[in-house]
Amino acid sequence: VNIDPVLKALMAALHGEGPAVEIVQDENGGPQAVPVETGVEDAAVVVRTSGSTGTPKATVLTIDALAASSVSTAMALRGEGQWLLALPLQYVAGVQVLVRSLYAGTRPWVMDQSNGFTPEAFTAAAEELTDKIRFTSLVPTQLQRLLDSPAPETLAVLRRFNAILLGGAPASPDLLATAHAEGLKVVTTYGSAETCGGCVYDGEPLDGVEVRIGEGELEGRILLGGDTVAAGYLDAARASKAAFFEEDDVRWYVTGDLGQLSDDGKLTILGRADDVIITGGVKASASYIQSKLEELDGVTAAFVAGVPSREWGQAVAAYVAVTDPTPEGIKGFTSRREAALGVLAPKTVLADKELLMLPNGKPDRLAMIDQLSKLHQGQ
């Protein structure tokens, strides 16, 4: 994949010598930097939110925000190095691989994903890296594939990375335990397009990033503040006003997540603010049910949502990734889930080898909810 034209346009935008750009796919599936008129001073990059919970929004990132993000990332990772690109460039995590490379003065290596993400292609790309200090960004699904019966050469290249940033979706405790047992330097990240990507590493805010928990109307919400926060959404004044605010010269972004801060300032993400399911008058947390399902033998990932139900108002439904999606395997899972969750056990379940995913590695919530709703209604 030739990314030189994209790097050139991105460098011009970051230096204020060219227009802001959005990286999109061209007709051949390759990356293309398209100039965007934002009306925002010092705008450098426009990235789309993933759209996992609704319509994707075009987020405007400034030169200063991206510079602050790169500097704080380098401080957290104790240096700059060469990056391997294994994520789509139209989303913030992919763009940031290029941005960090440009600030570091190193050449990123692009993984060949013409046949999708495979351990073989990742290993081949990682073997091409030349810098002693190496980084990559992955989503949990990718790391799971790399660690499922890994070849010795795959483990060897994974261990060579000074840090593997893991974000886009929560990583299961089992996946993190496996990665650490194999000697991988995995760093869990939390953030979004609105914060130039990950701005909290292993629960700790990056330098210059502030985290607090909302009160009043924003009770329990995670609020992220500091120099990495976006200028706003393109052509969406109402959405920008709801998501961003200024206070004491600090710009803040209101996330859709609930969290808590420990006494020493470590952030724990508790789940989405909209994840409460009211079924038959009983309140249930989708993230709690998801975590219980993921503790069951044979379950590698789970997604839980409420779907419309004539009988219950909402019914608990789950899409689960299982190691054995045969009828016999699913029968065993059914008895285990009822034993673990009782009345909160999902009434409607779809099981497959993997969850439905968006191109950026986040769960495709809308697609899974649609399928679960149809199944629950007998369609």
Short names for language-model regions:
Residues 19, 61-69, 82-145, 187:
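AMP-binding/adenylate-forming
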Residues 31-48, 80-82:
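Conserved pre-ATP/AMP-binding loop-to-beta segment of ANL
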Residues 226, 251, 258-343:
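AMP-binding/adenylate-forming catalytic core of the ANL superfamily
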Residues 229-256, 273-274, 290:
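Conserved ANL (AMP-binding/adenylate-forming) active-site segment centered on the GW(Y/F)…HTG consensus within
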Residues 42-71, 78:
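Conserved AMP-binding A3 loop
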Residues 205, 216-244, 284:
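Conserved ATP/PPi-binding loop(s) of AMP-dependent carboxylate-activating enzymes
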